[in-house]
Amino acid sequence: MEPVRPVPPPGRPDPPRAGSQAAVKLARLLREAGYESLRIQERLATGEELLARSPELPSYLRRLGDADELAVLLRLLLLGVPVTRARVEEHVGDALREHLGNAGLLVPDGDAVHGAARLVPHDELLIASDHAGAAETHADHVPGVHRPSVALAHLTVRRSGERALDLCTGNGIQAILLAAHAEHVVATDVNGRALAYATFNAALNGADNIETRAGSFFEPVMGEQFDLVVANPPYVVSPESAYLFRDGGMRGDAVSELVVRGTPPSLAPGAFACVLIAWSLDPGDPAARPRRWLEGSGCDAFLLHTSTDDPIETATVWNRDLVDRPEAYADALDRWLAYYRELGIERLGYACLVLRKRADGRDGWVEALQLPRSALRPAGRHVERLFETRGRLARMAAGRALLGRRPRVVDDAVVSQDTRFSGGRWHAQALSLRLESGLPFSAELDPPTARLLRELDGSQTLEEALAAAVDDDHARDEGLALARRMLEIGFLELDDEAEGDR
């Protein structure tokens, strides 16, 4: 009978390990066996990202069977289900089986074999972590890639630089991504098991410029500066101290405050940081607490606000592993809700805070942007462009100096219009504008705005475009303000920088 949940191996295996050459060979053998995202999605008949959980385990097992190499590998390394030793020897090639064994990824158990770790493809990467579900008894559990870590990767500004820092590296995926455009990456974590996974994953993906350091938050890099910092800390506002990856052991949102206040001193002038945070949100001023944490930081910042949850939503999300144990699940929800009542928390905000260290050291601006709940996509260049445009607008001598520039609609903007059938006829709906890449912003367009956008192709000044699109001075003033706002969020871009902008 097929299992209904992952079956942990006997004992607790150490994280896998391999030298750089052996790890690269292992990755090559896995890919040759079809252990890649698209092939796996085809076999499992899913378009879902292969993240840290496999809720459809019974369905997946029945689709796979166990009579070919990829099926056996997926059972062992993705789904966490043992396979008979005979099946492993019959279907997994000798070289691959040897490399998996040498890396500690196969655990014999009588006539069965277990996968010692979960191995998941993400785009071109392979990322190992502890199997999902193993967190129930181990504080140092190392999870796989979750949606927040995907969001952080998508929102990170990726510029070439000498030194980068991955704070609270976990399984190391952010450090590996940084290694592609930084000469040297430092990855820190208080969890030694996480550092072991990060080391293995770096080798598996051919990233030989990553240095791991053990320690809490900024302690391992005190006094150092970096060209880029990313951080996925244990930001969850939690009454627990059970899991290092989730619970920071501090009261309320103190972990997020510590990381936000500690990041600017670690940034070189002009450097960027991308940090995931959570905070007790004031509905009257949602960005109040993060803005206060940034006072005196010498940074400009965009607070990319991804979601707002009530206490029950938060408690449910972070305790869903207990759903098969109803009494423990109910107790955890009650404990978390009591904690939020004690702290007076009615709403919790979640965001990626993107910082840029000012060269002049002065206090900068902080702007909150609400991101749609739709799936994020790679947007680092869009985020960087927002900083560049904001700086150029600030350098213009006067507000109306923008009238002499030649803004244009960005290449990935799309205008569309729906029609609705009602009362025996078709009715045109409002025009809408959206971006097909970068941050998933969209907006409805009224007719004057649509006319203005048609004029903004970069061939004429904004003043000329406004004169062609609207009829009176009041409408032109409104159009100027609207064009400025559309520049600030990336629907428009400016022409090449002129002398007056500097």
Enumerate the predicted regions with their spans.
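Acidic, low-complexity/disordered tracts enriched in E/D and polar residues
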Residues: 4-72, 111, 134, 360-454, ...
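Long, charge-rich, low-complexity alpha-helical segments
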Residues: 69-116, 154, 165, 184, ...
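Mobile active-site "lid"/loop adjacent to the S-adenosyl-L-methionine
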Residues: 192-193, 233-258
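Class I SAM-dependent transferase core
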Residues: 108-159
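Flexible, glycine-/basic-rich loop-and-beta segments that form/coincide
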Residues: 311-388
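Conserved Class I SAM-dependent methyltransferase catalytic core
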Residues: 191, 252-305
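Conserved SAM/SAH cofactor-binding pocket of Class I
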Residues: 146-231, 237, 280
